[in-house]
Design a protein with these regions (language model features):
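C-terminal regulatory/interaction module of P-loop NTP-utilizing enzymes
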Residues: 1-221
Protein backbone atom coordinates (compact mmCIF):
# COMPACT_ATOMS: atom_id res chain seq x y z
CA UNK A 1 0.00 0.00 0.00
CA UNK A 2 2.45 2.63 -1.20
CA UNK A 3 0.33 5.78 -1.09
CA UNK A 4 3.13 8.14 -2.12
CA UNK A 5 6.60 7.98 -3.62
CA UNK A 6 9.80 9.80 -2.72
CA UNK A 7 8.46 13.09 -4.11
CA UNK A 8 5.49 13.05 -1.74
CA UNK A 9 3.02 12.29 -4.53
CA UNK A 10 1.43 9.11 -5.80
CA UNK A 11 -1.28 7.80 -8.08
CA UNK A 12 -3.77 7.84 -5.18
CA UNK A 13 -2.47 10.92 -3.34
CA UNK A 14 -2.05 14.57 -4.32
CA UNK A 15 -0.45 17.23 -2.11
CA UNK A 16 -1.66 20.73 -3.05
CA UNK A 17 0.05 23.69 -1.30
CA UNK A 18 -2.55 26.47 -1.31
CA UNK A 19 -1.36 29.96 -2.26
CA UNK A 20 -2.60 33.37 -1.22
CA UNK A 21 -4.91 35.08 -3.71
CA UNK A 22 -6.76 32.12 -5.23
CA UNK A 23 -10.17 33.40 -6.30
CA UNK A 24 -11.80 30.65 -8.36
CA UNK A 25 -11.61 27.11 -9.65
CA UNK A 26 -9.21 28.17 -12.39
CA UNK A 27 -6.49 28.52 -9.76
CA UNK A 28 -7.20 25.04 -8.40
CA UNK A 29 -8.17 22.98 -11.47
CA UNK A 30 -7.49 25.10 -14.55
CA UNK A 31 -9.41 26.89 -17.29
CA UNK A 32 -10.17 26.79 -21.00
CA UNK A 33 -7.81 29.12 -22.87
CA UNK A 34 -9.85 30.48 -25.76
CA UNK A 35 -6.78 32.09 -27.36
CA UNK A 36 -4.94 28.78 -27.59
CA UNK A 37 -8.09 26.76 -28.11
CA UNK A 38 -7.19 24.24 -25.43
CA UNK A 39 -7.71 23.54 -21.74
CA UNK A 40 -4.90 24.83 -19.53
CA UNK A 41 -4.55 22.82 -16.30
CA UNK A 42 -3.47 24.58 -13.11
CA UNK A 43 -0.02 23.89 -11.66
CA UNK A 44 -1.61 22.01 -8.77
CA UNK A 45 -1.99 18.82 -10.82
CA UNK A 46 -5.63 18.57 -9.77
CA UNK A 47 -6.94 18.28 -13.33
CA UNK A 48 -4.61 15.37 -14.12
CA UNK A 49 -5.44 13.73 -10.78
CA UNK A 50 -9.16 13.77 -11.59
CA UNK A 51 -8.77 12.54 -15.15
CA UNK A 52 -6.47 9.70 -14.04
CA UNK A 53 -9.06 8.73 -11.44
CA UNK A 54 -11.45 7.67 -14.17
CA UNK A 55 -9.39 4.55 -14.93
CA UNK A 56 -10.69 1.19 -13.78
CA UNK A 57 -7.65 0.53 -11.58
CA UNK A 58 -8.02 3.87 -9.74
CA UNK A 59 -11.62 3.15 -8.74
CA UNK A 60 -10.66 0.27 -6.44
CA UNK A 61 -8.99 2.36 -3.72
CA UNK A 62 -9.47 5.60 -1.83
CA UNK A 63 -7.88 8.65 -3.50
CA UNK A 64 -6.82 11.53 -1.25
CA UNK A 65 -6.16 15.21 -1.96
CA UNK A 66 -4.31 17.12 0.78
CA UNK A 67 -4.98 20.87 0.82
CA UNK A 68 -1.97 22.22 2.70
CA UNK A 69 -2.66 25.57 4.45
CA UNK A 70 -6.12 25.42 2.88
CA UNK A 71 -7.46 28.74 4.20
CA UNK A 72 -4.66 30.97 2.92
CA UNK A 73 -7.35 31.76 0.32
CA UNK A 74 -11.13 31.55 0.78
CA UNK A 75 -11.94 27.86 0.41
CA UNK A 76 -15.46 28.61 -0.84
CA UNK A 77 -13.92 30.38 -3.85
CA UNK A 78 -11.43 27.90 -5.24
CA UNK A 79 -13.51 24.87 -4.12
CA UNK A 80 -16.77 26.25 -5.52
CA UNK A 81 -17.00 23.44 -8.08
CA UNK A 82 -16.85 20.84 -5.30
CA UNK A 83 -19.03 22.27 -2.51
CA UNK A 84 -22.24 20.98 -4.06
CA UNK A 85 -20.75 17.47 -4.13
CA UNK A 86 -20.48 17.35 -0.35
CA UNK A 87 -24.19 16.45 -0.22
CA UNK A 88 -25.50 13.11 -1.44
CA UNK A 89 -27.72 14.59 -4.15
CA UNK A 90 -24.77 16.37 -5.79
CA UNK A 91 -22.03 13.74 -5.58
CA UNK A 92 -22.25 12.76 -9.24
CA UNK A 93 -22.40 16.33 -10.56
CA UNK A 94 -19.71 16.92 -13.25
CA UNK A 95 -17.53 20.03 -13.44
CA UNK A 96 -18.04 22.24 -16.49
CA UNK A 97 -14.57 23.07 -17.84
CA UNK A 98 -15.84 25.51 -20.47
CA UNK A 99 -14.31 23.46 -23.28
CA UNK A 100 -16.48 23.90 -26.42
CA UNK A 101 -15.70 20.32 -27.48
CA UNK A 102 -18.61 18.34 -26.08
CA UNK A 103 -16.58 15.19 -25.38
CA UNK A 104 -14.12 17.16 -23.22
CA UNK A 105 -16.43 19.73 -21.66
CA UNK A 106 -17.43 17.95 -18.46
CA UNK A 107 -14.98 16.60 -15.89
CA UNK A 108 -16.31 13.84 -13.67
CA UNK A 109 -15.07 13.57 -10.08
CA UNK A 110 -14.69 9.91 -9.04
CA UNK A 111 -16.78 8.97 -6.00
CA UNK A 112 -13.70 7.61 -4.23
CA UNK A 113 -12.02 11.05 -4.14
CA UNK A 114 -11.67 12.67 -0.71
CA UNK A 115 -10.23 15.98 0.51
CA UNK A 116 -8.20 16.52 3.67
CA UNK A 117 -7.24 20.07 4.63
CA UNK A 118 -4.84 21.61 7.12
CA UNK A 119 -5.80 25.09 8.31
CA UNK A 120 -4.49 27.76 10.67
CA UNK A 121 -6.34 30.43 12.58
CA UNK A 122 -4.31 33.64 12.57
CA UNK A 123 -4.05 37.01 10.83
CA UNK A 124 -2.63 35.48 7.63
CA UNK A 125 -5.57 33.16 6.94
CA UNK A 126 -9.21 33.42 5.89
CA UNK A 127 -12.00 32.51 8.34
CA UNK A 128 -14.16 29.46 7.61
CA UNK A 129 -17.71 30.34 6.64
CA UNK A 130 -20.78 28.73 8.27
CA UNK A 131 -21.62 27.27 4.85
CA UNK A 132 -18.35 25.35 4.77
CA UNK A 133 -18.40 24.34 8.44
CA UNK A 134 -21.86 22.87 7.94
CA UNK A 135 -20.58 20.47 5.29
CA UNK A 136 -17.30 19.18 6.68
CA UNK A 137 -16.02 17.75 9.99
CA UNK A 138 -13.44 19.97 11.70
CA UNK A 139 -10.90 18.58 14.17
CA UNK A 140 -9.13 21.05 16.45
CA UNK A 141 -5.51 20.16 17.17
CA UNK A 142 -4.92 22.55 20.08
CA UNK A 143 -2.09 21.48 22.36
CA UNK A 144 -3.49 19.87 25.47
CA UNK A 145 -1.92 17.67 28.11
CA UNK A 146 -4.18 14.67 28.56
CA UNK A 147 -3.56 11.80 30.92
CA UNK A 148 -5.30 8.71 29.64
CA UNK A 149 -5.57 5.41 31.46
CA UNK A 150 -7.16 3.63 28.51
CA UNK A 151 -5.31 0.75 26.89
CA UNK A 152 -5.36 0.79 23.10
CA UNK A 153 -4.78 -2.24 20.93
CA UNK A 154 -3.01 -1.74 17.62
CA UNK A 155 -3.65 -3.85 14.56
CA UNK A 156 -2.16 -4.09 11.09
CA UNK A 157 -4.01 -3.85 7.81
CA UNK A 158 -3.21 -6.44 5.19
CA UNK A 159 -3.15 -4.24 2.10
CA UNK A 160 -5.43 -1.43 1.01
CA UNK A 161 -9.01 -1.39 2.29
CA UNK A 162 -11.33 -1.60 -0.76
CA UNK A 163 -13.16 1.62 -1.49
CA UNK A 164 -16.56 -0.11 -1.41
CA UNK A 165 -15.89 -1.15 2.20
CA UNK A 166 -14.98 2.41 3.23
CA UNK A 167 -18.04 3.78 1.45
CA UNK A 168 -20.35 1.36 3.25
CA UNK A 169 -19.13 2.61 6.64
CA UNK A 170 -18.42 6.29 6.09
CA UNK A 171 -20.13 7.27 2.83
CA UNK A 172 -22.52 10.19 2.66
CA UNK A 173 -24.96 8.18 0.59
CA UNK A 174 -25.26 5.47 3.25
CA UNK A 175 -26.43 8.05 5.76
CA UNK A 176 -29.32 9.06 3.52
CA UNK A 177 -30.22 5.50 2.60
CA UNK A 178 -30.46 4.40 6.22
CA UNK A 179 -32.63 7.37 7.17
CA UNK A 180 -31.44 8.95 10.39
CA UNK A 181 -34.54 10.76 11.57
CA UNK A 182 -34.55 9.29 15.10
CA UNK A 183 -31.64 10.35 17.27
CA UNK A 184 -30.66 8.42 20.41
CA UNK A 185 -32.26 9.89 23.52
CA UNK A 186 -28.98 11.03 25.10
CA UNK A 187 -27.85 12.72 21.90
CA UNK A 188 -31.23 14.40 21.42
CA UNK A 189 -31.09 15.78 24.96
CA UNK A 190 -27.55 17.07 24.41
CA UNK A 191 -28.68 18.89 21.27
CA UNK A 192 -31.60 20.39 23.18
CA UNK A 193 -29.14 21.81 25.72
CA UNK A 194 -27.00 23.31 22.96
CA UNK A 195 -30.05 24.99 21.41
CA UNK A 196 -31.67 26.06 24.70
CA UNK A 197 -32.05 29.84 24.84
CA UNK A 198 -31.53 29.93 28.58
CA UNK A 199 -28.99 32.67 29.31
CA UNK A 200 -27.58 30.71 32.22
CA UNK A 201 -26.42 28.02 29.79
CA UNK A 202 -24.45 30.49 27.68
CA UNK A 203 -24.50 31.14 23.94
CA UNK A 204 -26.97 29.19 21.80
CA UNK A 205 -25.41 26.67 19.40
CA UNK A 206 -27.71 25.54 16.59
CA UNK A 207 -26.96 22.02 15.31
CA UNK A 208 -27.80 21.78 11.61
CA UNK A 209 -29.45 18.78 9.96
CA UNK A 210 -26.18 17.79 8.25
CA UNK A 211 -24.33 17.74 11.57
CA UNK A 212 -27.09 15.68 13.20
CA UNK A 213 -26.88 13.13 10.41
CA UNK A 214 -23.08 13.00 10.76
CA UNK A 215 -23.37 12.35 14.51
CA UNK A 216 -25.99 9.66 13.97
CA UNK A 217 -23.86 7.97 11.32
CA UNK A 218 -20.85 8.05 13.66
CA UNK A 219 -22.85 6.39 16.43
CA UNK A 220 -24.15 3.76 14.04
CA UNK A 221 -20.67 2.81 12.83
Amino acid sequence: YHLVNESGQGCDFLNVPISRGWVSGRDFIGFYNSLRGSYQPARTGMYQFLTNGASKEAKNSLRLVLLDEANLSPMEHYLSDFLGMFDAEGRSRPIDTGNPVEESRFLNVPLNTRFIATINNDSTTEPLSPRLCDRVPIISMDLQELESTQVHTAFELDGVIPYDTLESFFGVQSAYENGYEDLPLKLARAIELFEDRNRELGQVTVISKRKRMAMQLYLTV
